């Protein structure tokens, strides 16, 4: 007799997250911002210590470990960023993070500039969302328009004169020109000319 069924009675069934997709996007984007700010701060410290080593020629970093002051954005700015993050659709979260990382790699900003870059990336994502929504609305309008069948399709305007009615200069020249000499193997079928 197996004990596995007896051991399973105490297991809790797996629960799905009670968070909405908007909350998950908000949390993901804000975690990305915090992580990138820590990374930029670490890179700045490394650059400063490298410059200090070059200037002084001595490395005392092993001797004393100074407390690291961390930069944090203001609560008002954090709330504004959270508000913008909540408007981002989940499908735009990944591309926004990739664009943010790309801008950080290209520009190597100071810690104070990271939040501003993040806001600009979020604004780009919102603009792209609006453009795609407008395009989707236009395609929906075109797809919902009533269509006439091809059997009831009639041309409303006729182009006149038709190409066969238009006289060209080459036709006038050909009428006044003498007929080309005929070859002996071909009979000549012409009406006699009345002069």
Swiss-Prot record:
One Gene Ontology term, aspect cellular component: cone photoreceptor outer segment
Summary of the tissues where the protein is detected: Expressed in the retina and in particular in the inner nuclear layer, in rod and cone outer segments, in the outer nuclear layer, in the outer plexiform layer and in the ganglion cell layer.
GO biological process, one term: negative regulation of guanylate cyclase activity
Keyword Nucleotide-binding: no
Disordered as annotated region, ranges: 168-195
Basic and acidic residues bias locations: 168-177
Coiled coil feature spans: 22-54
Chain's role: Plays a critical role in the regulation of enzymes involved in nucleotide cycle in photoreceptors. Inhibits the basal catalytic activity and the GCAP-stimulated activity of GUCY2E and GUCY2F, two retinal guanylyl cyclases involved in the production of cGMP in photoreceptors. Involved in the transport of GUCY2E and GUCY2F to their target sites in the photoreceptor outer segment. Up-regulates the activity of GUK1, a kinase that also plays an essential role for recycling GMP and indirectly, cGMP. Plays an important role for the survival of rods and cones in the retina.
Disorder named in the UniProt entry: A spontaneous mutation leading to a frameshift and in an unstable truncated protein lacking the C-terminal 89 amino acids causes retinal degeneration. Homozygotes mice (called rd-3) display retinal degeneration, beginning at 3 weeks of age, characterized by complete loss of photoreceptor rod cells by 5 weeks, and cones by 8 weeks.
Protein name (Swiss-Prot/TrEMBL): Protein RD3
